[in-house]
Amino acid sequence: MSEATALSPAEFEQALRAKGAYYHIYHPFHVAMYEGRATREQIQGWVANRFYYQVNIPLKDAAILANCPDREIRREWIQRLLDHDGAPGEDGGIEAWLRLGEAVGLDPDQLRSQELVLPGVRFAVDAYVNFARRANWQEAASSSLTELFAPQIHQSRLDSWPQHYPWIDPTGYEYFRTRLGQARRDVEHGLAITLQHYTTYEGQQRMLEILQFKLDILWSMLDAMSMAYELNRPPYHSVTDQKVWHKGITP
């Protein structure tokens, strides 16, 4: 049996970009936020749960750095970690997200406590970090390519939220504005790594599955939020109205 022919770099990039059809910008929960149909509680719930994603992104990037023997790659990839954690004496994306939380009426200490993080969101994010730790560095780096679609989602929030949610302090939108440029820069680097590393048909198909895995994570996070904040079915809703789910267990 002859081996399947590998896609050309242009064809492979096209296949990667086609995965954008499954990006979470199309999830009903996100569509409702974009169209102005989200309640204050739903916006706050989204911000609180996405904070768990934000604080774990540097852990994901640190895992990639730890597994990568290529100094030139590390020199460029480390900027992602600084973008979120902040350089010495400077705020990063995590502080910007805390300001977004304040802008929608959440207390920063409550965000930091992660007490509002739903189990489904926690499990999805943890799966992403664990993948980055266990996979080879090229696969972990390539899993970040949902950034191909990120500028569109950040711009959609900047375009629609000020119009639909005047109660949100506009200073909270700093994170989205900053990420517009950062995401475009990160895409160029991540895409170059991916196109260079995956040169066989089997490897390219595996990479498409890895990208789908990351898309599954983002979609599943919104599924959990939709259950809790749209359908009013948070975990254990049938037996208690208390937030009894675990708040994170340190090994």
From Swiss-Prot:
Family: Belongs to the PqqC family.
EC number: 1.3.3.11
Functional pathway: Cofactor biosynthesis; pyrroloquinoline quinone biosynthesis
Keyword flag Ion transport: no
InterPro entries on file: Haem_Oase-like_multi-hlx (IPR016084), PqqC (IPR011845), PqqC-like (IPR039068), Thiaminase-2/PQQC (IPR004305)
Name of the protein in its database record: Pyrroloquinoline-quinone synthase
CDD domains: TenA_PqqC (cd19370)
Record key words, sorted: Oxidoreductase, PQQ biosynthesis
Catalytic activity: 6-(2-amino-2-carboxyethyl)-7,8-dioxo-1,2,3,4,7,8-hexahydroquinoline-2,4-dicarboxylate + 3 O2 = pyrroloquinoline quinone + 2 H2O2 + 2 H2O + H(+)
Underlying gene: pqqC
Pfam families: TENA_THI-4
Keyword Oxidoreductase: yes
NCBIfam families the record matches: PQQ_syn_pqqC
Biological processes, Gene Ontology terms: pyrroloquinoline quinone biosynthetic process; sulfur compound metabolic process
GO molecular function per UniProt: pyrroloquinoline-quinone synthase activity
Role according to the record: Ring cyclization and eight-electron oxidation of 3a-(2-amino-2-carboxyethyl)-4,5-dioxo-4,5,6,7,8,9-hexahydroquinoline-7,9-dicarboxylic-acid to PQQ.
Top EC group: oxidoreductase
Protein's organism: Pseudomonas syringae pv. tomato (strain ATCC BAA-871 / DC3000)
UniProt xrefs under PANTHER family: 4-AMINOBENZOATE SYNTHASE (PTHR40279:SF3), PQQC-LIKE PROTEIN (PTHR40279)
